[in-house]
Swiss-Prot record:
The gene is trmD. The lineage of its organism: Bacteria, Pseudomonadati, Pseudomonadota, Alphaproteobacteria, Rhodobacterales. GO terms for biological process: tRNA N1-guanine methylation. Homodimer. Keywords: Cytoplasm, Methyltransferase, S-adenosyl-L-methionine, Transferase, tRNA processing. Belongs to the RNA methyltransferase TrmD family. This is tRNA (guanine-N(1)-)-methyltransferase. It is found in: Cytoplasm.
Length: 244
C-alpha cells in the first residue's frame, strides 16, 4: 500500500489496482507531475493483491453461470475498498472504470475537480462482482465505446483531465477557459512561429494585433469546427443559445 497522509484541503486520488507500479505513470510528468510534487494534489495506490484469498492471494474466480474469463471477487474488493475509504470525508465519490459506464466529458471532470477526492477502482479480466457496485453505490465511468485490458489507463486519463482544472495546476486560468469544451465548442486552431512554414502562413488576422478581430475569428473558427466535426455538440450549443 502506498498510504499517504491526507493534506487538509488538497484533492486526492486513491487508486485500487492490481498494478500499483503503473502509477503515477504519465501523471508524474509535465504540469501534473510538477503539481503533484508541489502538493497541489495527491495520489495514493492501493494494491488489490494483499487482500486476496488463501496462500496464493487469489483475487478472482470463474463467472457464476459459466462463461469465459475471470471476475474480481466481492470479498476481496470489499476489504480493499473499505481500507481505501478510511479517512475520506466530504464529497468523495467511488468510481469504477468500465466501458458500460457514463462516458467522460468536460462537465464530469469539472464536477470531479470540485470534489474532495476520488477513489478509482481499476478492473481486470471480465470485470468485478456486481454486488460490489451495488453495495457501495459505485459510479461507473467510461473512457469511450471500446474495451481495454484494464482500467489503469482510463484512470490516468480521468485524473489528468480533472487535476488540470484544480486552481494553480496550469498556472494560467485562461488556458482552461479557452480550450475545447469549456464553452461548449471545440477549440479554435492554434499557431506559433515561424510565420511561414512550407508555404503555409499564419492567418493575417492573428498577426494584426487587433484583439477584437482576433477574438471574433477564434469564435467563428470554433463554431465552424464544432459544426463540422461534432454535430452533437453543435446542436447542444445552439439549443443553449436559443434560451438566452
Amino acid at each position: 500500500m502506498s498510504d499517504t497522509p491526507d493534506l487538509a484541503g488538497v484533492w486526492k486520488a486513491k487508486i485500487l489496482t492490481l498494478f500499483p507500479e503503473a502509477f503515477p505513470g504519465v501523471l508524474g510528468e509535465s504540469l501534473t507531475g510538477k503539481a503533484l510534487q508541489q502538493g497541489l494534489w495527491q495520489l495514493e495506490t492501493v494494491d488489490l493483491r494483499p487482500f486476496g484469498i488463501g496462500k496464493h492471494k487469489n483475487v478472482d474466480d470463474t463467472p457464476a453461470g459459466g462463461g469465459a474469463g475471470m471476475v474480481l471477487r466481492a470479498d476481496v474488493l470489499g476489504d480493499a475498498i473499505e481500507h481505501a475509504m478510511q479517512g475520506t470525508a466530504g464529497n468523495w465519490p467511488l468510481i469504477y472504470l468500465s466501458p458500460r459506464g457514463r462516458r467522460m466529458d468536460q462537465q464530469m471532470m469539472q464536477t470531479f475537480a470540485r470534489c474532495d477526492g476520488l477513489t478509482l477502482l481499476c478492473g481486470r479480466f471480465e470485470g468485478v462482482d456486481e454486488r460490489v457496485l451495488e453495495h457501495y453505490g459505485i459510479q461507473e465511468v467510461s473512457l469511450g465505446d471500446f474495451v481495454m485490458t484494464g482500467g489503469e489507463l482510463a484512470a490516468q486519463a480521468l485524473i489528468d483531465a480533472t487535476v488540470r482544472l484544480i486552481p494553480g495546476v496550469l498556472g494560467n486560468q485562461a488556458s482552461t477557459e479557452e480550450e475545447s469544451f469549456s464553452s461548449g465548442l471545440l477549440e479554435h486552431p492554434q499557431y506559433t512561429r515561424p510565420a511561414d512554414w512550407k508555404g503555409r502562413a499564419i492567418p493575417d488576422v492573428l498577426m494584426s494585433g487587433h484583439h477584437g478581430k482576433i477574438a471574433e475569428w477564434r469564435q467563428d473558427m470554433s463554431e465552424k469546427i464544432t459544426q463540422e466535426r461534432r454535430p452533437d455538440l453543435w446542436a447542444a450549443y445552439q439549443a443553449r443559445k436559443s434560451k438566452t
